[in-house]
């Protein structure tokens, strides 16, 4: 390859790109900053509350105990009674979809319960 093709492939310098791009600074209100830190506090409180639980105790190992009666032949079962036809309103209820319940999980828009210890805020000078 000659020098002209390699010169075309070079990337422009970073300083050239920075001069062309306009720089914008978004002004953020104190309320937005407080809301952001409130969300962070709720996340930290939730992880401490949900993640700090000790593991549940293990169930003891199952140790079956058998007796000779367990292996005896079972008496013959009686035939079940014929099924009854449900009423029309029961059929509708049977085919209806159950109401949706919200999935349990972490909702950062909900304030933590009042019985949980509050996370102390750091004391910082007002701006």
UniProtKB/Swiss-Prot annotation:
* Keyword terms, alphabetized: Nucleus, Plant defense
What changing residue 36 to G does, per the record, is: Slightly reduces NPR1/NH1 binding efficiency
Q: Where in the cell is it found?
A: Nucleus
Reported impact of residue 62 to A: Abolishes interaction with NPR1/NH1 and repression of NPR1/NH1-mediated transcriptional activation of LG2
- Disulfide-bond pairs as recorded: none
Of the GO CC terms on this record, one is: nucleus
Q: Where is this region: Disordered?
A: 1-28, 47-127
Consequence when changing residue 40 to G: Slightly reduces NPR1/NH1 binding efficiency
Q: What does this protein do?
A: Acts as a negative regulator of disease resistance. Acts on basal resistance, age-related resistance and resistance mediated by the LRR receptor kinase XA21. Plants over-expressing NRR display enhanced susceptibility to the bacterial blight Xanthomonas oryzae pv. oryzae (Xoo). Binds to and represses NPR1/NH1-mediated transcriptional activation of LG2 in vitro.
Q: What does the similarity note say?
A: Belongs to the NPR1-interactor family.
Q: What is this protein called?
A: Protein NEGATIVE REGULATOR OF RESISTANCE
State the species of origin. Answer: Oryza sativa subsp. japonica (Rice)
């Amino acid at each position: 390859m000659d020098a002209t093709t390699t010169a075309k492939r070079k990337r422009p310098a970073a300083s050239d790109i920075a001069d062309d791009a306009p720089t914008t600074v978004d002004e953020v209100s104190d309320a937005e900053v407080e809301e952001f830190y409130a969300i962070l506090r709720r996340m930290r409180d939730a992880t401490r509350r949900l993640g700090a639980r000790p593991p549940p105790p293990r169930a003891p190992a199952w140790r079956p105990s058998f007796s000779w009666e367990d292996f005896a032949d079972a008496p013959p079962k009686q035939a079940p009674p014929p099924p009854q036809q449900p009423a029309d309103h029961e059929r509708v209820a049977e085919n209806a979809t159950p109401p949706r319940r919200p999935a349990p999980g972490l909702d950062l828009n909900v304030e933590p319960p009042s019985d949980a210890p509050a996370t102390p805020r750091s004391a910082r000078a007002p701006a």
